[in-house]
Design a protein with these regions (language model features):
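Conserved mixed alpha/beta catalytic, RNA-binding, or beta-rich assembly cores of soluble enzyme
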Residues: 22-342
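N-terminal amphipathic/basic-hydrophobic helices that include classical n-h-c signal peptides
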Residues: 1-24
């Protein structure tokens, strides 16, 4: 059967023969996929891996909101490798387990998804994700997603998987560069007279041109407005980056130099976490929005959570920097007071 899943630990190349079907594995670059099917709609595809957590984070961007929403709903329903999925407009962020995970895949139904992520594997400095889609969802995985900027190549088990549309089933392995996730929290770069931490943080992110570093997003994190020592609104900033192997040190040196050279405060704090998920949720999430904390509190919790500080001051900015980092991937509620939702 040409549509049986291929083990993710199989070495695949242009001359690979699928033992189950006798078909040659067909490998196409994004340009070749585009030439075959015409330009479609995927705008970005990127995969970060956290080996310690056994997770991958997949970022996908499409020109249309409807396709992102339908794909997300069906991938979650199919289960497979997906642990969770979050949609913001035309962008999707998926958390997925590493390894092969059987999916409830087929024509969309009560417990069946018309599109599925069946596996995620790291091979050297690349990540291989295995996808299935039926009918229009097959067009998505076989013709649209493989064109996305960020894809290295697509591997199809057979010619049948390149026959898209109608009621056909398509399967594909999408290969992309391996990234890790780096989250950076920044606070106390300004004073009551001048400066704005969010402006400096965003300028830092957008000015980064290090090869192998991809700026993902930033969040403003509301800290406790009742603290006595603050500029005005008491807001920290968090930056998220996808980073290729061997590029983390260059990124951290760049961020520290940019932020500290642009800061007008002597209290600046910069906190860093490498990874997609923490081993446990930190009580500091609530405390930094509701209590008055000390630098010792922040440093102790950072050490416990695997967070390190790279600032040169060692002063009170570390409190908000850690808070911003911990909230940096929590969603829009990061911008509100504790318990406040939009």
């Amino acid at each position: 059967n040409p549509h049986e899943s291929i083990p993710l630990n199989t070495v695949i190349n242009d001359n690979f023969v699928n033992d189950n079907s006798g078909d040659i594995m067909i490998t196409l670059t994004p340009d070749e996929v585009r030439a075959r099917f015409g330009p479609l709609f995927s705008m970005k595809y990127l995969v970060m891996v956290d080996h310690n957590a056994g997770l991958a984070e997949i970022r996908e961007h499409c020109r249309a909101r409807g396709t992102i929403e339908w794909d997300a709903a069906n991938r979650v329903r199919a289960k497979g490798a997906i642990q969770s999925c979050h949609v913001e407009g035309t962008k999707m962020t998926m958390l997925a387990r590493l390894g092969v995970s059987p999916a409830n895949f087929g024509a969309a139904g009560k417990e069946i998804g018309g599109q599925a992520l069946e596996g995620v594997e790291v091979v050297g400095d690349e990540v291989v994700t295995t996808w299935s889609g039926i009918a229009g969802a097959g067009v998505g995985v076989a013709a649209c997603l493989p064109q996305a900027p960020g894809v290295t190549r697509a591997e199809y088990p057979s010619e049948e998987d390149l026959r898209i549309g109608g009621a056909r089933v398509c399967r594909v392995r999408i290969v992309s560069p391996l990234y890790e996730k780096v989250t950076i929290g920044i606070d106390d770069t300004d004073t009551r007279e001048e400066g704005a931490t969010w402006v400096l943080a965003l300028k830092c992110a957008e000015a980064c041109t290090i090869p192998g570093v991809d700026y993902l997003d930033m969040r403003l994190v509301q800290l406790n407005p009742a603290v006595p020592k603050k500029t005005t609104n008491c807001v920290g900033s968090a930056l998220n980056f996808a980073v290729r192997p061997g590029k983390v040190d260059a990124l951290l040196e760049y961020v520290r130099d940019f932020v500290e050279s642009g800061a007008v405060s002597n209290d600046t704090g910069i906190a860093v976490y490498r990874g997609i998920a923490f081993a446990e949720e930190s009580p500091y999430l609530k405390r930094v929005k509701t209590e008055i904390l000390t630098v010792d509190d922040a440093e102790a919790e950072a050490a416990r959570m695997g967070v390190r500080f790279i600032d040169s001051t060692g002063r009170k900015g570390r409190i908000g920097a850690l808070g911003a980092l911990l909230w940096g991937n929590k969603g829009v509620e990061a911008a509100g007071l504790y318990g406040e939702t939009l």
